[in-house]
Amino acid sequence: MKNRHHAAKDEEAAKAYAEIIKAMNEQLEVLKEKIKEQTEKPNCKEGVKRLETIPAIGRMTAAVLFHHLTSSKFETSNKFAAFAGLSPQQKESGTSVRGKGKLTKFGNRKLRAVLFMPAMVAYRIRAFPDFIKRLEEKKKPKKVIIAALMRKLAVIAYHVHKKGGDYDPSRYKSA
């Protein structure tokens, strides 16, 4: 909408876009306030706070992760990562040369999307320096490293939620 507002040649169209943008921003603020209210409830507050101790995970991401971790029973962190669509997929065929691997696109697209920005932040602030350095030494592209960080954040969130304690950097230092 902002692009359309900026590119509008007609004054009335620009005014209509401005009103739509204003209404959407107001709705966004209402939704953020509702999420904040939900995360302040006693049954959510502690779990969300624990998830916020993970580097690069903010309130909104923690709320989404908490929702998915509590609404479904995952037996392992790998199953949670698969649910988020963050499992690596190997491309192999009988006699062919092994193809490039990729992430499966199965799973919850929204959960995968929510983990993208925290992974970008984790990359930028070097939240997991040994992990990032190891991937960079293998000449992995930045997007591959971001995807690996998304999976790592999902796995850490699972363990923080399951164990019931805060994030412990020494536990995930070299992984």
Spell out what each predicted region is.
Residues 1-50:
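Long, charge-rich intrinsically disordered scaffolds of nucleic-acid metabolism proteins
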Residues 10-18, 41-45, 55, 101-105, ...:
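Conserved phosphate/pyrophosphate-binding and hydrolysis machinery centered on Walker-type P-loop NTPases
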Residues 59, 63-142, 174:
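Phosphate-backbone recognition surface of nucleic-acid-processing proteins
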Residues 126-175:
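Acidic, carboxylate-rich catalytic segments that either coordinate divalent cations
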Residues 2, 25, 116-119, 150-161:
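Short, amphipathic alpha-helical segments that act as regulatory/interfacial helices
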Residues 12, 16-19, 23-26, 30, ...:
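Generic recognition of short, well-ordered alpha-helical interface segments
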Residues 18, 48, 52, 59-66:
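Short, well-structured alpha-helical segments
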